């Protein structure tokens, strides 16, 4: 009986040890990727790096990514950070609607005043998001928290996200968390494509919409 218990205990310990080694090995392997060094970063000082796809920018400890102030409001980078023992992974996802409104950031190199600029090319541009062509009524796809109004004074709130397909302008207010109190006020333009037969028709509609403002 003692022999059986001893064998079971050894099996449990060995199994735990193997599992732990595999987990540690997998964790290490999954975290192996190119990391920018201080020497490499210095070569990009004053230049702009473009981010067009979901990716991880691995920077040495001490380097940070910042967003400039917007009309006096502090703006912070909206991505996810993962800390490792010798670097920090900055996860970029261009499909985040925040990048449609704020697309320029910079890398701060520790205590140095030097900067490397970052430009995030959003998956959906702000212009495309706020200019919609339709054939039937539709549900508008805007960032969570965006409010839509019928009037430019933003008093008459649109209920829900379902809009009629008609030539008209709505007014939107987007207050992302990462601008810490600042809100973007913009216009949402809807075009009934059934009534647009030519470029001339489109220009007439655009001129009419301008007169509404």
Swiss-Prot record:
Taxonomic lineage: Viruses, Riboviria, Orthornavirae, Pisuviricota, Pisoniviricetes
Protein origin, superkingdom: Viruses
The keyword Signal belongs to this UniProt entry's keyword annotation: yes
Protein name: Non-structural protein 7b
Keywords noted in UniProt: Signal
Signal peptide: 1-15
InterPro entries: Corona_6B_7B (IPR004945)
Keyword Signal: yes
């Amino acid at each position: 009986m003692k022999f059986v218990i001893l064998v079971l205990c050894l099996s449990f310990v060995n199994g735990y040890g193997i599992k732990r080694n595999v987990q540690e090995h997998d964790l290490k392997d999954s975290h192996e990727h190119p990391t920018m060094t201080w020497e490499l970063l210095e070569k990009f000082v004053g230049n702009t790096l473009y981010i067009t796809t979901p990716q991880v920018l691995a920077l040495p400890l001490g380097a940070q990514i910042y967003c400039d102030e917007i009309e006096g409001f502090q703006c912070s980078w909206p991505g996810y950070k993962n800390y490792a023992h010798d670097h920090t992974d900055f996860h970029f996802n261009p499909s985040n609607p925040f990048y449609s409104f704020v697309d320029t950031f910079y890398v701060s190199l520790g205590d140095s005043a030097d900067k490397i600029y970052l430009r995030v090319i959003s998956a959906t541009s702000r212009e495309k998001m706020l200019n919609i062509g339709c054939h039937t009524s539709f549900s508008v796809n805007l960032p969570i928290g965006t409010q839509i109004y019928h009037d430019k004074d933003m008093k008459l709130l649109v209920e829900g996200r379902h809009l009629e397909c008609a030539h008209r302008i709505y007014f939107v207010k987007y207050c992302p968390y990462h601008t810490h109190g600042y809100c973007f006020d913009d216009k949402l333009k809807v075009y009934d494509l059934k009534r647009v037969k030519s470029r001339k028709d489109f220009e007439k509609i655009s001129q009419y919409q301008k007169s509404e403002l």
